Amino acid sequence: MKKGAVGIGTLIVFIAMVLVAAVAAAVLINTSGYLQQKSQATGRQTTQEVASGIKVTRVVGKADSATNPTYIQELAVYITPNAGSSGIDLTKVRITLSDGQKQAIFKYRVGNSANELYFLAELMQNLGATIKFDNGSVQVYFDPTDWTSAAPTVIIDTTNKVIEIVNATVDSNDNHIKPATDSNVTISFDTPVSLYAFANPVSDVFDNDAFNNLTTKTDFGIAVLQDSDGSLDNKEYPTLTKGDLVVLALRVGGTQSLGYSSGVSKISVISTTTTDVLTKQSSVNVTITWTAVFGNGFDTGTKVTGKVIPEFGAPGIIEFTTPSTYTQQVIELQ
C-alpha cells in the first residue's frame, strides 16, 4: 500500500511538472511572438525614421526691388524626399527659421484653417493684420491699432456661418471696428471661401498662388515643380513622394496684401437693436494686409538657419549667409 501511494504521489508530481512546463512553454511562446512582432514594428519604424526625410536642394531669395535691392523678403525653399523615403505629408511639415534675433515657425494652412471663418477670426484675435471689407460702396475696417489695450474676443459659429466680435462696435466716423462695452459686431457669411497657398503647375516660382495666397505671417505655400505620380494633386493632402520636387514659399520680410472675393454677406452691430453697417451687393471684397515676421526682411550679411521638419524622418537643413551686397533681385542663397 505504501509503495502504491508513493507511486501515485510521484505520478501526481510528474503530471504537475508537465503541466507547469506546458504553461511555461505557452507563456514563452506567447512572449516570444509578442516580442517578435514588437521588434518587427520597431524595425519598420526605425527604418522609416532612418530612410525617410526631406532634402533641401537649394534656397533662392527675392529682394524688395529690382533696381535698388535692400532686403530679402521672399524665400523659395526647394525640397525633395530623401532616397528611400516613404510618402511625406506636407500638411504636417513645419519650417523653423531664425536670423539670430527672431525665430519663426511656419506651417501650411489647410482644412478648416484655410476657411475664411477661421483665418479671419485668427487674424482679429491675434491682431495679426489689417482687414478691409468692401461691398463697392461701403468699407468697414479692422485695424489692430484700434485695440491697444487688449485683443478682442472672437467667437466662430460654424452652424450659422458667423464671426462674432465681443464688446465691439463699428465707429460711425471712420467705419472701424473698435472696442465697446454694450454691443457686439457680427460678420455673417453666405458660403465662406477657402484660400490655399498652393500652385500646380508653376511657371514663375515667385509669382503664383503659393506666395500670393499667404493669409498670415506664419504660413508657407506649396508650389509644385515636379510630380510624376500625382501625389501632389490634392491641395488638401499634398504628399511628397519619390522624384517629386516642390518649392516651399515663405514671406520673410515686407508687407503682404491679399485681396479676394469673400463669402461675407453683411456686417452688423448688435446691441438692444441690430444695425446692418455693410450688406452684400454684387460681392464683398476682403483685403488682408500684414507685416512679415522678420520686419523688412534679411539685410546683407545676415546668417540664417532653419529646418524643414517632416512628421517623421530627417529634417532638411537651411543654412546660409546673405551676400555682402545685393546686385540683383533674385539671389541664390543655398
Curated annotation (Swiss-Prot):
InterPro entries: Flagellin/pilin_N_arc, Flagellin_arc. Keywords: Archaeal flagellum. Coiled coil: none annotated. Pfam families: Arch_flagellin. The keyword Acyltransferase does not apply. Disulfide bonds: none annotated. Signal peptide: none annotated. The keyword Signal does not apply. One of its GO terms (molecular function) is structural molecule activity. It comes from the Archaea. GO terms for biological process: archaeal or bacterial-type flagellum-dependent cell motility. It is found in: Archaeal flagellum. GO terms for cellular component: archaeal-type flagellum. Belongs to the archaeal flagellin family. Flagellin is the subunit protein which polymerizes to form the filaments of archaeal flagella. This is Probable flagellin PH0549. The lineage of its organism: Archaea, Methanobacteriati, Methanobacteriota, Thermococci, Thermococcales.
